[in-house]
């Protein structure tokens, strides 16, 4: 008996300036609305959180580019990610005829996490994803709903947890790959993974894991791109069909960097 072909699903992750500046957000929403078939949008919003925290007199503490989420900061990121940024995106998509539904991990228990254990650094109320309810998401998607997921999860004990948006996108794509033929696209402000960070045209068109390790050793790939690529390889190895890292405005092109096993 021939195996039934899976329906296609696109998971798009956006963050940074893209979701926080009106012009780039509007362009993104136009491009996202034009994606055919099933889709999910995962967003960040760290710069907005830093800005609002400063206005409230709360210092933002960072270690190795990662936010320390103390009790006061958790209130801010819950307001900003789950409220301001998420609902702006949902409203913008509804205006474009996309039946978007804003979700945090706590909503309908869609993503449960465990508070990150203290090792060298205490990151505070930060969650490491334990499970994604792919059945719930699939049911919503098959009803024509487009989930818009904020970078917040919960621990099942009444506590919200700040959670990396790249990780949420990767874990969501992995969970849904059992049901759909999933393409995961990480959008950011560069055209892809660059050989030379000062040359926007030096895009590496595709990269496998051995090349990734070599580029790290050579210092070509460093900083925040390392965890982004680690998430990408985990997704590919877990059954996601395709992972692309690209410019937000290029999601309808063949540009960017494609991740291979």
From Swiss-Prot:
Subcellular location: Cytoplasm
Site (Transition state stabilizer): 13, 228
Record-listed E.C. numbers: 2.7.2.8
Enzyme class at the top of the EC tree: transferase
Record SUPFAM superfamilies: Carbamate kinase-like (SSF53633)
GO BP: arginine biosynthetic process via ornithine; L-arginine biosynthetic process
Keyword list, A-Z: Amino-acid biosynthesis, Arginine biosynthesis, ATP-binding, Cytoplasm, Kinase, Nucleotide-binding, Transferase
Ubl conjugation listed as a keyword: no
Positions of substrate binding: 45-46, 67, 162
An annotated Gene Ontology molecular function: acetylglutamate kinase activity
Location (main, coarse): cytoplasm
Annotated InterPro entries: AceGlu_kinase-like_sf, AcgluKinase_fam, ArgB, Asp/Glu/Uridylate_kinase
Cellular component GO terms, alphabetical: cytoplasm
Pathway: Amino-acid biosynthesis; L-arginine biosynthesis; N(2)-acetyl-L-ornithine from L-glutamate: step 2/4
Keyword Repeat: no
Reactions catalysed: N-acetyl-L-glutamate + ATP = N-acetyl-L-glutamyl 5-phosphate + ADP
Function: Catalyzes the ATP-dependent phosphorylation of N-acetyl-L-glutamate.
Family: Belongs to the acetylglutamate kinase family. ArgB subfamily.
Alphabetical list of HAMAP family matching this protein: ArgB
Record's protein name: Acetylglutamate kinase
Biological source species: Bacteroides fragilis (strain ATCC 25285 / DSM 2151 / CCUG 4856 / JCM 11019 / LMG 10263 / NCTC 9343 / Onslow / VPI 2553 / EN-2)
Gene: argB
């Amino acid at each position: 008996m021939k195996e039934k072909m899976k329906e296609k699903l696109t998971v798009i992750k956006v963050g940074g300036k893209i979701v926080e500046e009106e012009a780039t957000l509007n362009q993104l929403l136009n491009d996202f609305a034009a994606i055919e078939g099933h889709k999910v949008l995962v967003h960040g919003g760290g710069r907005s959180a830093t800005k609002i925290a400063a206005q409230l007199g709360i210092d933002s503490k960072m270690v190795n580019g990662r936010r320390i989420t103390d009790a006061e900061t958790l209130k801010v990121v819950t307001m900003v990610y789950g409220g301001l940024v998420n609902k702006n995106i949902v409203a913008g998509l509804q205006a474009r005829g996309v039946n978007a539904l804003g979700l945090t991990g706590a909503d309908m228990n869609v993503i449960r996490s465990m508070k990150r254990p203290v090792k060298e650094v205490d990151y505070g109320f930060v969650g490491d994803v334990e499970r994604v309810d792919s059945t719930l998401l699939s049911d919503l998607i098959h009803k024509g709903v487009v989930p818009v997921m904020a970078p917040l999860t919960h621990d099942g004990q009444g506590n919200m947890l700040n959670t990396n948006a790249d990780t949420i996108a990767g874990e969501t794509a992995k969970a849904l790959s059992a049901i759909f033929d999933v393409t995961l696209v990480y959008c950011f402000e560069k055209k892809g993974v660059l050989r030379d960070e000062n040359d926007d045209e030096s895009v590496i068109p595709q990269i496998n894991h051995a090349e990734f390790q070599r580029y790290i050793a050579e210092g070509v790939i460093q900083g925040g791109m390392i965890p982004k690529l680690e998430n990408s390889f985990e997704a590919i190895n877990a059954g996601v069909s395709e992972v692309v890292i690209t410019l937000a405005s290029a999601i309808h092109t063949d540009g960017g960097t494609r991740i291979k096993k």
